Amino acid sequence: MSKPILIVGGGPAGLAAAHALARVGQSSVLVEKADRLGGAPILSGYAKLVPTGEWAKDAIGGMVDRVIKDPLVEVHTSARVDAFSGNPGAFSVRVSDGRAVEVGAAILATGFTHFDSVNKPEWGFGTFPDVVTTTQVEQMISSGKGVRCPSDGRKPKRVAILLCVGSRDRQIGREWCSKICCTVSANMAMEIREELPDCHVYIYYMDIRTYGLYETKYYWRSQEEFKVKYIKARI
């Protein structure tokens, strides 16, 4: 295709798309609304990623560097698509930074937003300082400061991880499974136990859905090697 391809979103999917296109000689225009590339893993301060175990800043940082240095990728950060019109093979795009470009196709890789746990007040998030989200724990780990109780900075002796908060829940109109939270939680539990071997970690679950090869690597390993306790319950 002689015209560049528009990519909306500079997270992992958008970065992978830009790199894949460049490998076959196809130019692209990547538009990201944040002031930097990387998406949720970078902007939210993720720790180690599943299933590779790489630190987010290293894995995603490598993807960002590869795209930024590629002459076939034109990057626009702190920008949005203001206008998009035309027909397949001939679209006109106006970017909020003033750039106008003609593209042949568009790839939407706009990412996601984390569930706001304030919408499940029964678990005390937003009321009790030591009730935190997975993302907040990820930030504690990735900062290098370790997992601590926000209320007073002490090392926790017991941690309960509640699964399916914000998913598989008809009361809030979210009946679907996220497909990744069980695995992420098992990984997080192992990270907590690795840092705090005297801390007891409990995972409360409806069903464990560690899809594919994740069952052995995360579900069973977290129990057998790290002694994480799983408790079946309807939270």
Identify the role of each PLM range.
Residues P4-L6, A13, A59-F115, T210-Y211, ...:
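Feature captures the FAD/FMN-dependent oxidoreductase FAD-binding
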Residues I42-V81, P121-V137, A186-E191, Y214-I235:
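N-terminal glycine-rich dinucleotide-binding loop that anchors FAD/FMN and/or NAD(P) in oxidoreductases
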Residues P51-G53, A90, I208:
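Short, flexible loop segments at the rims of nucleotide/cofactor-binding pockets, characterized by
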Residues M1-L43, F84, R99-A100, G111-G212:
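Rossmann-like dinucleotide/flavin-binding elements
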